[in-house]
Structure formats: C-alpha cells, structure tokens
Amino acid sequence: ALSVDLTQVDIAFLSHAHNDHCGGLEAFLKLNDRAKVYMQKAVWGQYYVVTPSKCAYIGMDAVLKNYEDRFVLCDGVQKLDEELTVFSAVPGRELWSGANDTLREKIGEDYPRDTFRHEQDLLVTENGKTALFAGCAHCGIVNILKSAEDVLGRAPDAVFAGFHLYNPSLGKSEPDELVDAVGEKL
C-alpha cells in the first residue's frame, strides 16, 4: 500500500501485545526472513478484553513463539543507536482513558486491569528532529509525552499516535471533557 518492499525491512517495532497490533506479525515474519522485531519482554502475558457479555483473548498468537530468535525483548529505556530509542514503563495516570477498563491480563484465575507493561513507544531522531511513535497510547498520550521528555531532555518535535479514546468493545467514546483536556495538554 505504501510501495514499501517488506522483504527489505531490517528492523521492526511492536507497540504492544494486543492482536490488533500484532495480528499481522506472522505474515510479516514469513515474508521477511531477516528483520529483528523489538518488543517488550512482557509480550507473552495473557491479555484479554472482558465485558459483561464476553471474555476474549487478545494477546500474541502462540505460533509467534516459532520466531523468538527474531525478537529483541526490551525493558525500560533502550537506545538502539543515535536515531532510535524505545521506552516503556510509563508512570502516571493523568487523563487516563476509560476505554482501558475492559482490557485485562489473566494472572492465575484473576483478570486484573492490564497495566500495559507490554506497551512501548519509539523515538526516531533524524537531522536534529525527533518524532514520537506511540501506537494506541494505552498509558495515556499525556503520560507518554512526559516520559518522552524525560528520555529526550525536551519535548519531541512530532507525535504519531492513537489516543485510545474510544472503546470498540463497548462502542463508546470518551466524554468530550476528557478529549478536550487531552487536547489542551498537547
């Protein structure tokens, strides 16, 4: 679609371990036999969406374990080179989206709320400018931006992210007040 030859890609990043982001990973790995895929070490957690009417697994497909030699498991801040840095473990819950409330991690027989320890964000620096890539931004774009500023020592020049302000499982958007408050912080 973007006229990119995926066989020539030499590095990839997984934003988090929900199947709407990792669902195409096996197809990519079959097509491309060399790219390393950077992801958080917590990607193999048991992630679910839980609503009053369903409990469905939304984590990594077990077939992806066949490609573990291609995965680079990260934790915290990892500077790959002068251009690429991944970071995770975003603290804070400022302007946290209620859309996260249905997302859970199965631990034993319990389903506590997902802490998003499997989510990571990417900083790309080129020609003195830095862009932040934040996937769904489950940890909250305001909190992620604060962490990016801590890593960089300044705000990024551009942000590319989903803000996760809509819950597709419930068909419900966040209140206008939350959306406006997030917009004001940006």
Mark where each language-model region is.
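Active-site-proximal beta-strand elements of phosphoester/diester hydrolases
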Residues: 1, 84-90, 130-136
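Active-site metal-binding motif and surrounding structural segment of the metallo-beta-lactamase
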Residues: 2-44, 150-160
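Flexible, charged surface loops at secondary-structure boundaries
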Residues: 5-8, 30, 80, 124-125, ...
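Divalent metal-coordination and catalytic microenvironments
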Residues: 16, 37, 83, 134-135
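Active-site environment of divalent metal-dependent phosphoester hydrolases
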Residues: 18-23, 44-47, 79, 138-142, ...
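Metal-dependent catalytic neighborhoods of phosphoester/phosphodiester hydrolases
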Residues: 23-32, 54-57, 170-178
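Cap/insert and terminal regions of metallo-dependent hydrolase folds
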Residues: 36, 115-121, 125-186
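Metallo-beta-lactamase
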Residues: 43-120
